[in-house]
């Protein structure tokens, strides 16, 4: 039975991966470590609470003693690191938190894995072990009107968030190059789907449209992103973890490039038609001052993972956005719990003066 340490399991992508993996593998053990910061919510894991294949541990990936004790207790086969502060606006306001969680947390996980998996006397690594770092296409910087990010594209991050993720990626690769640690890195495009914290574009717009709130759109809204349905991403991570060549980076993209303003207008149209609400219209859109250092376009070339592992994005955007809207409409109580308290304060601070 394979044993995984999953960090950031109560967040958006991490919780979707937990659901995906438990559904796919009848014999597996997931030890899920999450600090439960603002974006980590145990309600995301409510459906698997009683599953004996799932063990939840509340804690910080920076906690050396805790992580050490988990390796000693469970002898993990795989570590998949989803844990990260991930919102660019928050990183601009408070970059130190991103360095601590995204860089120092990653280094702590690498160190503890090295101690547990490397036999210093034999100078060999235990068989069947792997560390997988879940990263982002933002580490590459911005693209022009044409072309795509390749795995060989130089790292050129532009925000404190993407800089912290690029730093973490470089530490992961350094542990491979220096010590021979068995690692992979995946770099994905913009994810969307169930359980996403509503500071991100799609759930934010769905929630605001429903309540006739203004829809803040940065600049002209023509920033282009490649949209990847989260279940497709989970499948890619699973395939890389179990079949990826050690030491390799794999780009994971959706082949769904869309401008942000198109996303917003699509959500307006979908909810107007479904809810039969004339208060839902493009009049809700409010263009606000553009984000500092806002990259204009991202685009991923996933040819390598397709050729090496047979992965491809199965969910076109037109289908994925319908599935996503359906999920949020069916989980209003989840959204109400998420958007109470500290979130409201944060939302006002981010957008009230723009």
Name each model feature, range by range.
Residues 3-4, 17, 30, 59, ...:
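C-terminal substrate-binding subdomain of Rossmann-fold SDR/epimerase-dehydratase oxidoreductases
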Residues 8, 12, 130, 159, ...:
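Amphipathic alpha-helical recognition patches that constitute DNA-binding helices
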Residues 66, 97, 104, 197-201, ...:
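Residue-level recognition of oxygen-bearing side chains
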Residues 146, 157-164, 194, 198, ...:
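The catalytic Tyr-centered alpha-helix of NAD(P)H-dependent dehydrogenases
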Residues 36, 190-193, 223-224, 291-292:
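Short histidine/acidic/glycine/proline-rich micro-motifs that form metal-
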Residues 1-191, 241, 323, 328-331, ...:
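N-terminal Rossmann-like NAD(P)+-binding domain of SDR-like oxidoreductases, especially those catalyzing
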Residues 41, 50, 145, 194-198, ...:
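Residue-level signature of the cytosolic catalytic core of signaling kinases
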Residues 42-45, 143-146, 196-199, 263-265, ...:
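Short aromatic-enriched loop/helix-cap "lid" or pocket-rim segments at secondary-structure transitions
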């Amino acid at each position: 039975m394979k044993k995984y340490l999953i960090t950031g399991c109560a967040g958006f992508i991490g919780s979707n991966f937990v659901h995906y993996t438990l559904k796919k593998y009848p014999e597996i053990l997931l030890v899920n470590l999450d600090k439960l910061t603002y974006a980590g919510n145990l309600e995301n894991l409510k459906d698997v609470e009683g599953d004996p294949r799932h063990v939840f541990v509340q804690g910080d990936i920076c906690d050396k003693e805790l992580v050490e004790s988990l390796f000693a207790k469970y002898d993990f086969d795989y570590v998949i690191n989803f844990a990260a502060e991930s919102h660019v606006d928050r990183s601009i306001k408070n970059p130190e938190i991103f360095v601590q969680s995204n860089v120092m947390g990653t280094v702590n996980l690498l160190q503890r894995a090295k101690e547990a998996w490397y036999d210093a006397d034999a100078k060999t690594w235990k068989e069947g072990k792997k560390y997988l770092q879940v990263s982002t296409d933002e580490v590459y910087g911005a693209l022009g009107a044409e072309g795509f990010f390749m795995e060989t594209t130089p790292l050129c991050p532009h925000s404190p968030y993407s800089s912290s993720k690029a730093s973490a990626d470089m530490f992961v690769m350094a542990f491979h190059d220096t010590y021979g640690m068995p690692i992979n890195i995946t770099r994905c495009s913009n994810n969307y789907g169930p359980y996403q914290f509503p500071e991100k574009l799609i759930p934010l717009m769905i929630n605001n449209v429903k309540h006739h709130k203004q829809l803040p759109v940065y600049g002209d809204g023509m920033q282009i992103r490649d949209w990847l349905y989260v279940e497709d991403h989970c499948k890619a991570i699973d395939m890389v973890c179990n079949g990826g060549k050690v030491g390799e980076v794999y780009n994971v993209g959706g082949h769904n490039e869309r401008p942000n303003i198109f996303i917003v207008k699509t959500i307006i149209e979908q909810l107007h038609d479904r809810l039969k609400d004339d208060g839902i219209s493009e009049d809700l859109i409010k263009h606000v001052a553009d984000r500092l250092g806002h990259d204009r376009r991202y685009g991923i070339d996933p040819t390598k993972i397709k050729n090496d592992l047979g992965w491809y994005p199965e969910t076109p955007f037109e289908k994925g956005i319908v599935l996503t809207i359906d999920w949020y409409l069916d989980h209003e109580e989840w959204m109400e719990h998420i958007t109470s308290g500290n979130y409201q304060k944060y939302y006002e601070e981010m957008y009230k003066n723009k």
